[in-house]
C-alpha cells in the first residue's frame, strides 16, 4: 500500500498491465526421495506490496520461457537473437527477448502449421494431409508430445525469417495457481503447490512453461504476479456449515488455505478432506499439517487414496463411494462440496460418483440424482476449481 499525506494507506491494484514483482522466499520439494514426481511448495513474499487475497483466490504468474529452449530455437532459425522483431504487445524488441518473455514457443498453433506447409515442401507432404477438418483427431495425435522446435529442426527448408516466425506465434499467457495459504496466517506471503511438468517425448526433454519457471526460481528471485479473485470458490459465510473438499495432487492447495483460515478463526465447523496421490510414503503433501489439524479438530475427517500402494489403483472417487452413506448424510446437513484439480478425468469421475451416491444412498432415480446435483451447483454448494 502507498502512504497518503494524512497517514492512511491506499490499496494498490495489481493486474497484468501493472503486476507486482514478488520474490520467492521458499522453494522446497513436497515429494520425497523415491517419488516419480517433483511437486514444490513455493512461498512468495508480498510484504510491502499492499496486495490482498482471500482463500479460494488464484495467483496469476507471468512466466518466462526456458532459456535453453530459446537458444535451441535461435540455432534452428540460424539467428543470433539480436534481430529486431515486434513482440506480442506490438512493441519493438530483440528476437531473443521476444522468445523469452512475449511469445508462446512450445505448442504449435494450426496457423503455424498452415504457414509451415506453405513454406516447406517436405512439411506439405507429411503434415498437409492432416490439416483438413476431417483429420482433427489424427492431427491431435500427431502433435502430442511435439513442439515448435521439432518442426524447425525437421523442416529447415521453411527458411523462416525472424519476423515471419514470430508472426505465427501466440502470446505467452499468464498461468493461474490456486493459492495454498490463508492471509489470516500468512498476510505477507502467498503459498503455491506446484507440480513440475517434465517428460521425454520424441527424443527431447519437454518442460511445462510455468511450472518449470517457478521450480527454477531460487530464493530471492522475482517474477511478475497479481491476485486473480475468485467469484464463488470460497468458504461458506456461516462457519458452522460443513465442508467436503476433494483435492487430489496439487488440487489440495486451496483446501490447505481453507483449513488454515478456519484454524485462524478458531472455527470447528465440520470439514472433510479427500486427498489422493501415487504413494503415501513419497507423495503425501502436507501430511504433518493435516495430521495436526485432525488432532485439534479443524479437520474432522481425512480420507486418502494412494493409487500405487496396492495392486489395484484406488482414487478419490473410490473413497467417496466407500464413504457414500456418511457423505450423503453430510450433504443432507447442508455441506458444501468442493473439488479442485484435474478437469479432464478426475473431476468427471468425482461428478459421476456424486451422482451415484445420490442414487445409492439417497434413494434417488437417475433423473432425480441429476436434478439434485444440478441444484447443488445452482445453490453454490457444488463448487469446482478445475484445470
Go through each PLM region and give its residues.
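FNR-like FAD-binding dehydrogenase module
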Residues: 1-387
Amino acid at each position: 500500500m502507498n502512504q497518503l499525506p494524512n497517514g492512511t494507506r491506499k490499496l494498490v491494484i495489481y493486474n497484468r498491465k501493472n503486476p507486482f514483482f514478488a520474490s520467492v522466499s521458499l522453494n522446497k520439494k513436497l515429494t520425497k526421495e523415491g517419488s516419480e514426481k517433483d511437486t514444490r511448495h513455493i512461498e512468495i513474499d508480498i510484504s510491502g506490496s499492499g496486495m490482498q487475497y482471500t482463500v479460494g483466490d488464484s495467483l496469476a504468474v507471468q512466466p518466462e520461457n526456458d532459456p535453453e529452449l530459446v537458444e535451441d530455437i535461435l540455432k534452428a532459425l540460424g539467428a543470433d537473437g539480436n534481430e529486431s522483431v515486434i513482440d506480442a504487445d506490438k512493441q519493438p524488441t530483440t528476437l531473443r527477448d521476444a522468445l523469452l518473455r512475449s511469445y508462446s514457443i512450445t505448442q504449435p498453433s494450426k496457423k503455424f502449421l498452415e504457414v509451415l506447409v506453405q513454406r516447406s515442401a517436405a512439411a506439405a507432404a507429411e503434415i498437409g494431409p492432416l490439416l483438413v477438418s476431417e483429420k482433427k483427431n489424427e492431427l491431435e495425435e500427431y502433435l502430442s508430445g511435439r513442439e515448435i522446435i521439432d518442426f524447425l529442426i525437421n523442416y529447415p527448408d521453411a527458411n523462416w525469417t525472424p519476423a515471419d516466425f514470430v508472426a505465427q506465434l501466440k502470446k505467452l499467457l499468464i498461468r493461474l495457481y490456486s493459492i495454498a495459504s490463508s492471509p489470516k496466517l500468512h498476510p505477507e506471503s502467498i503459498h503455491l503447490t506446484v507440480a513440475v511438468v517434465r517428460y521425454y517425448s520424441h527424443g527431447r526433454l519437454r518442460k511445462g512453461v510455468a511450472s518449470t519457471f517457478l521450480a527454477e526460481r531460487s530464493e530471492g528471485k522475482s517474477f511478475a504476479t497479481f491476485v486473480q479473485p475468485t467469484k464463488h470458490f470460497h468458504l461458506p459465510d456461516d462457519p458452522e456449515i460443513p465442508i467436503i473438499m476433494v483435492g487430489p495432487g496439487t488440487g489440495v492447495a486451496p483446501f490447505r488455505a481453507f483449513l488454515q483460515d478456519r484454524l485462524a478463526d478458531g472455527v470447528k465447523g465440520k470439514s472433510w478432506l479427500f486427498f489422493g496421490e501415487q504413494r503415501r510414503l513419497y507423495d503425501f503433501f502436507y501430511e504433518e499439517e493435516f495430521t495436526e489439524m485432525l488432532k485439534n479438530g479443524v479437520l474432522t475427517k481425512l480420507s486418502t487414496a494412494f493409487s500405487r500402494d496396492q495392486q489395484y489403483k484406488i482414487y478419490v472417487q473410490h473413497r467417496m463411494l466407500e464413504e457414500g452413506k456418511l457423505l450423503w448424510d453430510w450433504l443432507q446437513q447442508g455441506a458444501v462440496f468442493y473439488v479442485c484439480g484435474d478437469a479432464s478425468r478426475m473431476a468427471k469421475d468425482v461428478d459421476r460418483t456424486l451422482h451415484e451416491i445420490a442414487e445409492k444412498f439417497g434413494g434417488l432415480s437417475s433423473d432425480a440424482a441429476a436434478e439434485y446435483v444440478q441444484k447443488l451447483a445452482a445453490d453454490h454448494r457444488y463448487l469446482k476449481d478445475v484445470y
